[in-house]
Amino acid sequence: MRHYEIVFMVHPDQSEQVPGMIERYSATITNAAGTIHRLEDWGRRQLAYPISKLHKAHYVLLNVEAPQEAIDELETNFRFNDAVIRSMVMRVKHAVTEASPMVKAKDERRERHDFASEANDDSEAGDSEE
């Protein structure tokens, strides 16, 4: 089986349907004896350019190992699902399991924010003791 990287973008008004879509597409892959190496829900993000007068979309990334039939079925599902505004399936040489740069940057921002809020709490506690 080959390795694929799949990204699909969902209409921002349909964001509440994303978990169900992820589950359905994941089931399509696993039912065809495929494996999911990485699944990332990037959330709602700004588009580089408007698509159908939309400026934001909900992004989902999958790295999978699956047979061609499962990939064909996924592409058909993407094409006929009106909530999916764009999708891209790329074949890659190896399975990718580490976090993507998008998730790494998000985690770093969260860590900096947590560190800053802890430093704020410490300085406020120091002020009240004096």
Swiss-Prot record:
It holds the Pfam family Ribosomal_S6. Residues 104-116 have a biased composition (Basic and acidic residues). Residues 119-130 have a biased composition (Acidic residues). Keywords: Ribonucleoprotein, Ribosomal protein, RNA-binding, rRNA-binding. GO terms for biological process: translation. SUPFAM superfamilies: Ribosomal protein S6. Residues 100-130 are annotated as: Disordered. GO terms for cellular component: cytosolic small ribosomal subunit. One of its GO terms (molecular function) is small ribosomal subunit rRNA binding. Gene3D superfamilies: 3.30.70.60. PANTHER family: MITOCHONDRIAL 28S RIBOSOMAL PROTEIN S6, SMALL RIBOSOMAL SUBUNIT PROTEIN BS6M. Belongs to the bacterial ribosomal protein bS6 family. This is Small ribosomal subunit protein bS6. The lineage of its organism: Bacteria, Pseudomonadati, Pseudomonadota, Gammaproteobacteria, Enterobacterales.
